[in-house]
Amino acid sequence: RKYNAVMVAHDGRFLDREQLPPGLPSGAHPKTLHPNYRFFDDDRHFFSLRQLAAAQGRDVADWILPFEVPTTTGIFRFGTQLCEDLWCDDYCLDSAPLDTYGLLAERGVDAVFNLSASPWTWQKNDKRHRTVQQILSRQSKRGISVPFFYVNQVGAQNNGKNILVFDGDTTAYEADGSRAARARAWTQ
């Protein structure tokens, strides 16, 4: 199986998550939600975390666990998302959004990082900002909130069918959804 995945390493080794069910390589956290619209065709090339869970007859939440990295001040616990995982309100599980941020926040992470290759489209950054605020606000009302970091690619890419441009617009969000810092677009 091929995964579109975040690979997490520390001191030259991929990080294991001991509580993780079998089925993934060390240090890997695959994309949970695959887009299949416009020029996206993830399911054609990759196996998603939802597909892995279904294939093993398990709940997808079993795989949405934090990574832990030792630091000089203690253990830093963080969660990862890939691109489409942010747009969770468009994907439901048991009639509720499949909110990986919420699951990670419930599991005591210190931060969540969304690593994206999200192409530029007109006013998409405003839509993304509203979506992040909505997700963080929903969790904050439950008394669960952590900072969120959106890290987007900059540049251009030819996928064989389309030429896509990526504007960056990396943004750090406070736990309440307000912007803490924002990088200049197109220059990262």
Segments predicted by a language model, with ranges:
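Enzyme catalytic cores with a strong preference for nitrogen-chemistry domains
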Residues: 1-188
